[in-house]
UniProtKB/Swiss-Prot annotation:
Organism, scientific name: Colletotrichum orbiculare (strain 104-T / ATCC 96160 / CBS 514.97 / LARS 414 / MAFF 240422) (Cucumber anthracnose fungus)
EC supergroup of this enzyme: hydrolase
Biased composition (Polar residues): 346-358
Protein name from the UniProt record: Peroxisomal ATPase PEX6
Pfam family, any one: AAA
Chain positions recorded as ATP binding sites: G1034, P1035, P1036, G1037, T1038, G1039, K1040, T1041
Membrane topology classification: Peripheral membrane protein
Annotated EC: 3.6.4.-
């Protein structure tokens, strides 16, 4: 293969007539033929009709002059009924046009490397097609695609092979010399270049690269054994999982050592891994202790295994002795036995039931049968088998289908008119155990759960109750599951080596074998009363008593046809609405017209309907009822979007009596009759009340198409029957479900217990209260009739007022009760809107007629007291925590069938969406889907080819088919911005720690207070108190507000800013209510920061205000009460941090500064050193363009120590303004010089013309020089004077103690041998009673209390009393000498 042929040219160059946007066409069916006689190489050939259908725009393109044809790309996949670009596993392959092939044929060589990925997919979906491809070909589906150029390819090689390539062996050994249009590249010199060149040549041997493909290396084989080297493997491709190699593709090498099997050399790459008859899973596993089991039909057990065991497919061990004479094998390849030399296991030490030479009764969960195995300790004689006339059959675990299985996949293929509801599916290996063939009639009945141990049901009265119970059974057709729908059970078979002690007999009794599974329609399972286990047995062929010689009962037989049938409406909110009647009746007609239905008296019939289509047709002015019904009946399922289900119940059935043995026929078919809509008389007999199947144990919403199916897990087959996942259920939903179940239980109805009235309250809108109630009702099978109070008010309008509103409420509630009081829950949304006085009596009357009433409100205070007192339970729906948000996100993703990238961590997304409720999380998922679509459209537009979004999805990969982590990041950021606006939080600028200069000690204290509870909540889980209040105080302009914004940005917290006037209200009690609302919003939006700016105006000292009513005092009291709950260790207030800022802490109420409130006081002052000023200048000028000659250090040396942070900001802004002014003057001067020069241009030169034609980079760049800073400094007036700064230092000393210099003087002067100490500066100036600051001068008499000293006496808490003389009395208090945040390192 030549170098020029390694990478095919892009499609855009091949065909100049290719349209810019290609239209997506549906997939076509074709046959894949593997024939190595007519075609060689990796490129396949395509029949002419397929080429014309797939590439119609290339129909008239002339061929090349040299006769060569262009390589096109198509995507193939194993045939399935409904292929999808996003869910089907496609394989992109290169093809050429051929006119010699049969129509609808794709032909490849069996040794084509392009089919490696397809063979792997086929092995998972339909392994039997691998061995039958040579006879009739493989049925596939084919699409036209454009192969994308890959950005990055990750490959894996062994270390030894990598060294050989680096040494240049791959450069000299090539299959063919390079030839073609391009010139041969230069010989690489370095080992890395030689490795890259060899890898690019090796990958170039693949026409299309797929993730997981193996590729041969350009290395010579072994000189002695002539075994080729081990191949390399493509681990990952980006941005899609398959594409072509280009010159810009990056190759990332992953080195490693591949360990071969014991006693076996590593195999070379086969021509085709799976299409040569050997399954991929078995080609490497050929160790001596590996064997294939015979057709023993043993199922997976729960026995503990170790890594030493060998995985193999096993089958059920219940031989049942003589009962299985017809258990014949079908000569599959799986039944081949690989013999090995028998070896005796090593004797186990101690007492064991596993000894050499004795019957092995238990072997790691493998259970032998008491009849077939001699000397066994098991027996089949149990209370179950001892019952007389017990029906025999096989026991299966019942599993409801999550989607219908199409008839095209079944064998034998059912008739088109056969009822799909009368089918049951089991594994093919289980058909012989039942004793029938696929498509035969069997008897299915509900069965009890088998006993958990091997002793059977030896319960009290097990043998005495011998009366046969009536079983709920019916005839159905049994079919084997199509290939790929189920995985054969895998268990661990012990190897020849004795690796561990065998289990004893009693330990083995704890191992419960899993029964085989029978898949059945969830509606049919509900008609069988939803049992957990089913028993299948063939219908006995009765002796023929009629005329003729043909047998009476065959697989083609049908139950007797019905002559007359009565259908009852199951009253539900859908069937009760007049607007949906046409859709309901049309759906019922469609249900019986499509198939010959098999029903029995009492059966439930589920009919999915499109309510939106039915309502739109019903509202047409010229709509006729019967015509609309006919239109709805003729609508195809593909064209409808089913959103509701109408339920019906079968009443009386009268069959056609054709012979005298009608009773025997009825006994044979269990009362089931065929309903042919063309010959049956169908009557409606009113309404019936009934529950629907409970959704917590049934899959009927997915089966009927009301909900989308969840995406299959990784590694699961696309056709596998998915089981119902265990959904997230919140504790409140579980509690609500229990209340509803108790209120509607037969015991509560019989005892006439009072109804249950539940009020769901919340402080958020769109939190999911109505959805919670509806889902809880669906879990137990109750109907939910929702009434919106605002809709009633809008319909009532102004005419009638309260009277009409009351009448509408009564009418809606009566309609809801017509669905059955014990089967329907009445849901009233926004009950706070019903404020009229007559509503109390109306609600009382409604409660008398119903069993369950649920109401929702977002403002419980607006609900009238009379209405609120009627509710027996009041449940608050709070904002979801992290675990609940993760569960809600997972439920949304599964309900919408969204495929997530494996790297997406829903727990991390839940952490980022703090304070968002269920409605906001739905918005997050919707935004992520939009972001994914935009990302795919952006990728397709960048390629420069006619690439559509479908081409990306067909190419596969997480980036193309899944919602990635980046999509969720974009969605979360947008949702948080919307949430911040909805709750009234201000838009926070992007302020980080880099914008805050200095303040290192403040940053450390903030980290300790805020970051520790957020990152390590387990430290505070046991009630440990945490600090949640921080008070910033100091001169104005020192960065208190800036620091609060930086805290909110750095820790991703919601930010509330509260001003003093916002809390004041003229009405009594509203000001305190505003404080409560602020903290309630903060708790709902946690983690968040509540920032009280100018706290002295919000919470001044109580008793000093002269306002009437004491409004400020009440605000302070309410604020204190809210702050007391912030430091608790429980979860009710965690994540709420309160930050206050003030420049007058002496005016605050002293109660605010006590422990548990604002107990962390941080002083933000001015910078007292030039180094601190330099840090501030660097933070403010980090986005400036400074002249290279500027030295911020020299600028800082010339600044006074009275500048605050705001002054530094003004200094830098003025310097930038001066630089811009200087640069503008320079440009004006150059323009004047140009105008003065003689030139051909007439007229003045504009500034825009100068920048377009004459400007140099120096003219555009605005650089700030040192002279600009100095000029701005000369003009700047400090905002805080030196006298004011000294006052703030005195205030700081009041709260934190004297400065460090005074402390050192005190420690020098207070060295006395006695326990009493003299306090420096203890004389106080005072003219009355009160407290004075220690450190004053003058004469007086008072007490000075020194606390927190460093000597041994002070540590014992002794008090020094200093007496003096003066004109008054006072107390001089020396504060904590090691106070909080006394270190002013890095302050402004």
């Amino acid at each position: 293969m030549t170098t020029s042929e390694l990478v095919p040219p892009p499609p855009a160059r091949r065909s100049p007539r290719t349209r810019r946007r290609r239209q997506d066409k549906p997939a076509l069916s074709a046959r894949l033929v593997l024939d190595d006689h007519e075609i060689n190489g990796d490129v396949g050939v395509l029949s002419e009709d397929l080429f014309t259908d797939l590439f119609p725009h290339l129909r008239n393109v002339p061929s090349r002059e040299d006769g060569s044809e262009d390589i096109h790309h198509v995507a193939i996949a194993p045939w399935e009924p409904s292929p999808s670009p996003t869910e089907t596993a496609w394989t992109v392959v290169p093809v050429l046009k051929s006119s010699a092939l049969k129509p609808s044929t794709v032909q490849f060589s069996p040794s084509s490397l392009s089919l490696q990925s397809f063979a792997t997919i086929l092995q998972q979906v339909a392994p039997s097609k691998l061995s039958s491809h040579s006879r009739s070909g493989i049925e596939v589906q084919i699409l036209d695609v454009v192969a994308l150029s890959l950005d990055t390819v990750f490959v894996s090689l062994e270390s030894e092979l990598t060294k050989r390539l680096e040494q240049g062996e791959g450069t000299f050994f090539r299959d063919r010399p390079n030839k073609g249009k391009g010139k041969a590249p230069a010989q690489p010199d370095t080992p890395e270049d030689r490795l890259i060149s060899a890898l690019r040549v090796a990958l170039g041997s693949l026409k299309v690269l797929h993730s997981g493909d193996l590729f041969s290396l350009p290395l010579p084989p072994h000189p002695v054994t002539h075994v080729p080297p081990n191949p390399g493997k493509i681990m990952l491709c980006e941005p899609v999982s398959q594409g072509i190699l280009s010159d810009d593709t990056k190759i990332v090498l992953m080195r490693g050592r591949v360990h071969a099997k014991r006693g076996q050399s590593a195999p070379a790459i086969p021509p085709n891994r799976s299409l040569n008859g050997v399954p991929e899973d078995d080609e490497d596993d050929t160790a001596n202790d590996q064997f294939y089991s015979a057709a023993e039909d043993r199922y997976k057990t729960d026995a503990a295994t170790t890594e030493m065991d060998t995985v193999t497919e096993t089958e059920e061990s219940d031989l049942s002795g003589v009962d299985h004479d017809d258990d014949l094998s079908d000569d599959f390849m799986d039944d081949m036995i690989s013999l090995q030399a028998p070896t005796l296991p090593t004797t186990a030490s101690g007492v064991s039931t596993m000894q050499p030479g004795t019957p092995m009764t238990i072997g790691r969960g493998r259970k032998t049968n008491g009849i077939a195995t001699p000397a066994s300790v098991f027996s089949n004689f149990t209370a179950t088998t001892a019952r007389p006339d017990r029906p025999r059959g096989r026991l299966f675990k019942a599993q409801g289908l999550i989607r219908p299985i199409l008839i095209d996949l079944l064998h034998p293929k059912p008739a088109p008119e056969d009822d799909e509801e009368a089918r049951i599916f089991v594994d093919i290996a289980s058909l012989s155990k039942i004793g029938c063939f696929s498509g035969d009639w069997v008897r299915v009945e509900a069965a009890e759960e088998p006993p958990a141990n091997g002793f059977g049901a030896f319960g009290l009265g097990s043998f005495t109750s011998l009366e046969p119970t009536e079983s709920n059974w019916r005839p159905v057709r049994v079919y084997g599951l199509p290939e790929g729908y189920s995985q054969r059970p895998v268990t661990r078979i012990p190897s020849a080596k004795h690796g561990e002690r065998r289990m004893s007999f009693f330990e083995s009794q704890l191992q419960k074998p899993t029964s085989p599974t029978a898949y059945i329609s969830p509606v049919l399972l509900a008609n069988l009363e939803s049992p957990s286990y089913l028993r299948l047995s063939p219908i006995k062929r009765g002796t023929y008593q009629g005329k003729g010689t043909l047998p009476k009962f065959t697989s083609a037989s049908r139950p007797p046809y019905a002559r007359d049938i009565t259908i009852q409406h199951v009253r539900s909110p859908v069937t009760a609405e007049r607007a949906y009647q046409s859709a309901v009746l049309g759906g019922l007609k469609r249900y019986f017209a499509q198939k010959i239905r098999l029903v029995r008296t009492g059966d439930l019939i589920a009919v999915p309907i499109d309510t939106q289509l039915g309502k739109a047709l019903q509202e047409q002015p010229s709509a006729n009822g019967s015509e609309v019904d006919d239109v709805m009946a003729l609508a195809k399922d593909e064209s409808c979007r089913f959103d509701q289900v109408a339920w019906f119940k079968v009443g009386h059935i009268q069959t056609q009596k054709t012979d005298a043995d009608h009773d025997q026929t009825e006994d044979l078919w269990g009362g089931v009759a065929c309903i042919d809509s063309s010959s049956v008389a169908m009557h409606g007999s009113g309404f019936a009340t009934s529950r629907t199947p409970a959704t917590k144990a049934s899959t009927w919403p997915y089966y009927l198409g009301v909900k989308k199916m969840p995406m299959k897990s990784n590694g699961a087959s696309a056709l596998m029957v998915p089981e119902q996942d265990q959904r997230f259920v919140s504790p409140l939903r579980r509690r609500l479900r229990e209340l509803l179940a108790a209120a509607t239980s037969p015991r509560a109805i019989h005892l006439k217990m009072p109804p249950v009235a539940i009020l769901l309250t919340s402080t958020h809108r769109n939190i999911g209260k109505a959805t919670l109630a509806s889902e809880a009702c669906s879990d137990i099978g109750l109907h939910t009739y929702a009434i919106d109070a605002y809709d009633i008010l809008s319909e009532a309008g102004t005419s009638g007022g309260d009277v009409k509103t009351e009448g509408l409420l009564r009418t809606r509630s009566e309609r809801a009760m017509s669905c059955g009081p014990d089967t329907t829950a009445l849901l009233i949304k926004h009950v706070e809107a019903l404020t009229a006085d007559r509503m109390v009596s109306t609600m009382k009357e409604i409660l008398q007629d119903t069993r369950v009433l649920v109401a929702t409100t977002s403002d419980v205070d607006k609900v009238p007291d009379g209405v609120r007192g009627l509710f027996s339970h009041e449940l608050e729906v709070g904002a979801p925590d992290e675990a609940e948000r993760e569960g809600i996100l997972r439920t949304i993703v599964e309900d919408r069938g969204i495929n997530l990238d494996p790297e997406v961590d829903l727990n991390g997304i839940a952490l980022k969406t703090a304070a968002l409720v269920a409605g906001d999380l739905v918005d997050v998922v919707d935004r992520a889907l939009v972001a994914q679509r935009l990302r795919l459209e952006q990728i397709s537009s960048k390629t420069g080819q006619a690439v559509t979004v479908r081409d990306l999805q067909v190419a596969g990969g997480a980036m193309a088919r899944c919602v990635t982590k980046g999509d969720f990041d974009v969605a979360v950021e947008a949702a948080r911005k919307n949430f911040a606006g909805a709750i009234g939080a201000p838009k926070i600028p992007n302020v980080t720690w880099d914008d805050v200069g200095g303040l290192n000690n403040v940053k450390d204290a903030v980290t300790e207070t805020i970051q520790l509870p957020l990152e390590r909540p387990e430290l505070f889980a046991k009630g440990m108190k945490k600090r949640s209040g921080i008070l910033f105080y100091g001169p104005p302009g020192t960065g208190k507000t800036l620091l609060a914004k930086a805290i909110a940005t750095e820790y991703s917290l919601n930010f509330f800013s509260v001003k003093g006037p916002e809390l004041l209200n003229m009405y009594i009690g509203e000001s305190e209510a505003n404080v409560r609302r602020v903290f309630q919003r903060a708790r709902d939006a946690r983690p968040c920061v509540v920032f009280f700016d100018e706290l002295d105006s919000v919470a001044p000292k109580r008793g000093n205000q002269g306002d009437s009513g004491g409004v400020m005092d009440r605000i302070v009291s309410q604020l204190l009460a809210e702050l007391d709950g912030m430091s608790g260790g429980d979860d009710t207030s965690g994540g709420v941090f309160v930050i206050g800022a003030t420049n007058r802490p002496d005016l605050l109420d002293p109660a605010l500064l006590r422990p548990g409130r604002f107990d962390k006081m941080l002083y933000l002052g001015v910078s007292d050193t030039h180094d601190k000023q330099l840090k501030i200048l660097e933070a403010l000028t980090r986005k400036f363009t400074l002249h290279p000659s500027v030295s911020l250090h020299s600028v800082a040396q010339q600044l006074p120590f009275t500048y605050t942070g705001a002054d530094f900001y003004a200094l830098c802004s003025d310097a930038m303004l001066k630089a811009v002014t200087r640069q503008a003057a320079s440009v004006d001067a150059k323009i004047r010089e140009l105008e003065a020069q003689p030139r051909s241009r007439t007229g003045p030169i504009s500034t825009a013309y100068f920048f377009d034609h004459h400007a140099t980079p120096e003219d555009i760049a605005v650089m700030v020089t040192e002279e600009d800073f100095l000029a701005a400094n000369r003009e700047l007036v400090p905002s805080v004077s030196a006298g004011e700064l000294s006052h703030y230092e005195q205030v700081r000393a009041m709260f934190e103690g004297p400065p460090e210099k005074d402390r050192q003087q005190q420690q020098q002067q207070q060295q006395r041998p006695s326990g009493l100490r003299a306090v420096s500066g203890s004389s106080v100036v005072s003219k009355g009673k009160g407290k004075a600051i220690a450190g004053g001068s003058g004469k007086g008499k008072g007490k000075a209390v020194a606390t927190g000293s460093d000597d041994e006496y002070g540590s014992e808490g002794e008090v020094a009393v200093v007496n003096g003389k003066g004109k008054g009395k006072g107390k001089a208090v020396a504060g904590f000498q090691d106070g909080t945040a006394s270190d002013d390192e890095g302050l402004y």
